[in-house]
Amino acid sequence: MTEIINVTAREILDSRGNPTVEVEVAVGTGDVGRAAVPSGASTGEHEALELRDGDKGRYLGKGVRKAVANVIDEIAPAVVGLDASDQASLDARMIALDGTPTKSKLGANAILGVSLAAAKAAATAHGLPLYRYVGGAGARTLPVPLMNILNGGAHADSNVDIQEFMVVPLGLPTFAEALRCGAEIFHALKKVLKGKGAATGVGDEGGYAPSLASNEEALAVIMEAIGQAGYEPGKQVALALDCAASEFYDKKAGKYELEGEGKRFDGKGLVEYYAELAAKYPIVSIEDGCDEDDWATWKLLTERLGAKLQLVGDDLFVTNVTRLSRGIEQGVANSILVKVNQIGSLTETLEAVRMAHRAGYTSVMSHRSGETEDTTIADLAVACDCGQIKTGSASRTDRIAKYNQLLRIEEELGGAGRYAGRSAFEALR
């Protein structure tokens, strides 16, 4: 019934105007699954390889014709005839066909496109929504949105070093109310920034990208916006940071340079800097607080703040069970950011989430800075019982599409659904 009968691919554009891969998989029932692959701006060194053409005369070298050709000429002949419902076997076939640790032969963008499209085709053939097909009967938890309303770092042209400042509406009763809360704070922040004469253009993920004096000023204006929107900081709305520290780490000197503030820290100094921010503001989560290979400082950070805050490994773990296993063994971080294109297949993504949950780590389903209208991660957040999702601000359709899909899922679940709310973070207390 769900035998794969055809696989095709094409080059489309993502939210930054860069090419990406879109794949369609058809199964014997006549159902077709379509998936578009996201792309990151700040990427971890240990991520699976996103195959680009490198032809500078076309899309500045970022074309994906090679990856598209690999889907059509290499992957399709190997998977036609396989059962799309057997996700593990399908993904294993593609991984073996590639034969490299980072999927550099065929491209993680090629493999992932087929992996996700096949899951969608199988779900449709079985008459199930994707979240139910992947997550089973128990998939009913709507995630807390970590809404990136102010951008810095690699996501914006400004002097703010921390990459993302997020509002976390954890004290609301439903996902719909949490989303409304985040949107109202987003609009209030625009007024606050305008009042200060700051720019209100948005960055890659839909958050404002003003030029502010310091990271702390960014936190202060968000706190003001929360109040102006009529919400209570700490009780109804918390804050989260994605520091993307690998972007401001000087590997040779072993120092962290916050150029926008004129500050330079060793590992211990950086940890104390975060501790001071957490003591002053209602921060519940810090992502990538240290460089992806600075395990010693990660350990210091976890020992200092791990009992109080969610410490999320993104570039640190890259959705990879080998790196996550090392983190668990060493007691580093207490949460994993989940990005399907970091590892390059649905099966491996699910394995990483399961490993994290078994170890008592939380998980945060995440978009990339280069997105499309594809809403797969919204379904996966519910399917994997992540309890949290990062998919940008309350602007840009590529971000809103995921939130709208979660609204549909919440409506479909009705009384059986539950909003994770504060419970998504309570395991850390």
From Swiss-Prot:
A single GO cellular-component term on record: extracellular region
One Gene Ontology molecular-function label: phosphopyruvate hydratase activity
Pathway entry: Carbohydrate degradation; glycolysis; pyruvate from D-glyceraldehyde 3-phosphate: step 4/5
Cofactor(s), names only, from the UniProt record: Mg(2+)
Keyword Metal-binding: yes
Residues forming coiled coils: none
EC category name: lyase
Chief place where the protein resides: cytoplasm
Keyword Calcium carried by entry: no
Subcellular location: Cytoplasm; Secreted; Cell surface
Alphabetical list of InterPro entries matching this protein: Enolase (IPR000941), Enolase-like_C_sf (IPR036849), Enolase-like_N (IPR029017), Enolase_C (IPR020810), Enolase_CS (IPR020809), Enolase_N (IPR020811)
GO BP term, example: glycolytic process
Protein's UniProt name: Enolase
Active site: 205 (proton donor), 339 (proton acceptor)
Keywords: Cytoplasm, Glycolysis, Lyase, Magnesium, Metal-binding, Secreted
Gene responsible for this protein: eno
